[in-house]
Amino acid sequence: MIFMMGLFFSSCREEKSDPGYLAGIAAKGYYDLLLEGKYKEFVDGYNQPYRLPNSYQDQLLMNAKMFVEQQQDEHKGMVKVNVLNAKADTTHHVADVFLQVVYGDSTKEQIVVPMVEVKDAWKMK
């Protein structure tokens, strides 16, 4: 009986989400936006602690669009993105997310997306 009560109370405590998992979900979400052609939303996923000049914002948007076009030319586009792994350093509020990009020509590429936690949200570095 006491054992059962211990199990009950241990299952009631609040579970804290794994920071690496959360960073991985965020990184995949940003790259999914890129696949959908939502370049502004993708660029908004970068940690920008200070307001950037409009000309720099425009350049980041152009770079994102050119990157997608280049992948279309070289690999028949990006088809999907998968999270392979994520390692978080909770002391420094950073994480490295390992993504797999699957291309239209059936090739796959692994990339690392460095992330930083800012006000309880994961942003790309």
Enumerate the predicted regions with their spans.
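Short beta-strand element of the conserved SAM-dependent methyltransferase core
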Residues: 1-2, 99-101, 115
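Sec-dependent bacterial lipoprotein signal peptides
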Residues: 1-10
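Short, low-complexity N-terminal intrinsically disordered segments enriched in polar/charged residues
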Residues: 10-36
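Stable alpha-helical elements in mature extracytoplasmic
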Residues: 23-27, 38, 42, 60-64
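Short, well-ordered alpha-helical segments enriched in acidic and aromatic residues
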Residues: 36-51
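Boundary/linker segments of alpha-helical solenoid repeat arrays
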Residues: 53-58
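Surface-exposed, charged secondary-structure patches
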Residues: 61-108
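Short beta-strand edge/turn micro-motifs at domain boundaries
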Residues: 108-125
